[in-house]
């Protein structure tokens, strides 16, 4: 029998209180999914989810009686969130699928642990553990797959994908995180065969999963595999023909500069340097207005590799300037840009329109024109202080008078 190691999270007071409340009458609660998988792999655990045969109302009653705050976050689907000792834990009643359409599932509550596990996606995610003893339940070979670095669907791969088409993208993400060696052939063939079904998913779900893939420490291999498999023909037809070289340079520069991965920056590496295309992709993926503007700005200025980083930041912000250098620069220029922008904020021009008027310029369009010229010179001189800005204003006004 496989038993969880004595990980720190297993002794947290909040978790112990929840387990005690739900198992007080001899009922069962188990740790499920990622916490079990990651603990077995020796990885840090962030979310500790639980499952129980108790119905949601009974779960809430018991937790409330134990003075544990509980929120009915997804009670229609059997999920509540318990907050104990500052920790948040999702607790879900065992379920079975009644009907699925590739986008959502209609479920019924159940009392069979294996049946609950069978509705999950991959064998490595269908591991359950006793919170007291750490004993691991494995009905579908997840332990062997975890040891082998194999990401495989539970049972029939085509059926699992038909239940939720997002599992196509999840396959690639989990393979990148936990896979070693060749992809599981049966699962891989199934996602390729079903790739057109991605069109049925909401744009938000596609965007969320795609950005998670791009946020992985080094997604180059899996992104290349997705391109080879025709996944991007369905969800990102704008994929640039030369994306691999740009993506490789970006990842190398991120490593060189120790800059944290950013999904949006990496998404821009997959696209042509065309702001219209960037906006088109952002709109289709239902990205926020801020994200849309950021993608477009990167595309518009990606070839601007001569202008000093701080001057570029004045035009499009420090994040945009840094991202452009990481995308388009060599390692030396990327490093120089990151160093120049680190901890630096774009300053405001230390002059206002009133300062121009005070120098004798009549209120009107000349004020804005002179102020714009002063700002351009001030930026070109690397943002000097107020005294130099005033000198520049006097010079510009003098030229106007001449």
Per-segment meaning from a language model:
Residues 1-402:
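Catalytic cores of the polymerase beta-like nucleotidyltransferase superfamily
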């Amino acid at each position: 029998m496989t038993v969880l190691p004595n990980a720190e999270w297993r002794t947290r007071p909040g978790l112990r209180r929840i387990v005690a409340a739900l198992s007080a009458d001899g009922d069962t609660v188990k740790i499920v999914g990622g916490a079990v998988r990651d603990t077995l792999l020796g990885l840090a655990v962030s979310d500790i989810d639980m499952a129980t045969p108790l119905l949601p109302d009974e779960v809430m009653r018991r937790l409330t009686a134990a003075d544990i705050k509980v929120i009915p976050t997804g009670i229609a689907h059997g999920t509540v969130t318990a907050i104990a000792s500052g920790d948040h834990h999702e607790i879900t009643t065992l379920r079975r699928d009644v009907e699925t359409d590739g986008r959502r599932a209609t479920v019924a509550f159940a009392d069979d642990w294996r049946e609950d596990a069978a509705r999950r996606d991959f064998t490595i995610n269908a591991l359950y553990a006793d919170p007291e003893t750490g004993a691991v339940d494995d009905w579908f070979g997840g332990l062997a797959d975890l040891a082998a670095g194999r990401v495989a669907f539970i049972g029939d791969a085509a059926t699992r994908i038909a239940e939720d088409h997002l599992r196509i993208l999840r396959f690639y993400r989990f393979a990148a995180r936990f896979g070693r060696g060749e992809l599981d052939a049966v699962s891989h063939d199934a996602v390729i065969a079903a790739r057109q079904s991605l069109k049925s998913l909401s744009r938000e779900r596609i965007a969320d999963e795609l950005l998670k893939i791009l946020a992985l420490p080094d997604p180059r291999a899996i992104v290349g595999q997705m391109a080879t498999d025709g996944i991007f023909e369905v969800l990102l037809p704008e994929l640039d023909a030369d994306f691999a070289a740009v993506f490789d340079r970006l990842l190398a520069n991120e490593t060189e500069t120790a800059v944290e991965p950013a999904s949006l920056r990496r998404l821009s590496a997959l696209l042509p340097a065309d702001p219209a295309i960037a906006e088109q992709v952002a709109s289709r993926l239902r990205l926020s207005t801020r994200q849309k503007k950021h993608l477009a700005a990167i595309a518009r200025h990606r070839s601007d590799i001569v202008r000093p980083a701080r001057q570029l930041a004045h035009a499009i912000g420090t994040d945009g300037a840094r991202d452009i250098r990481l995308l388009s620069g060599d390692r030396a220029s990327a490093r120089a840009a990151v160093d120049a922008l680190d901890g630096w904020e774009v300053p405001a021009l230390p002059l206002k329109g009133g300062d121009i008027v005070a120098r004798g310029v009549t209120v009107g369009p000349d004020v804005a024109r002179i102020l714009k010229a002063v700002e351009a010179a001030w930026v070109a001189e690397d943002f000097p202080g107020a005294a130099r800005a005033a000198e520049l204003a006097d010079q510009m006004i003098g030229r106007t008078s001449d």
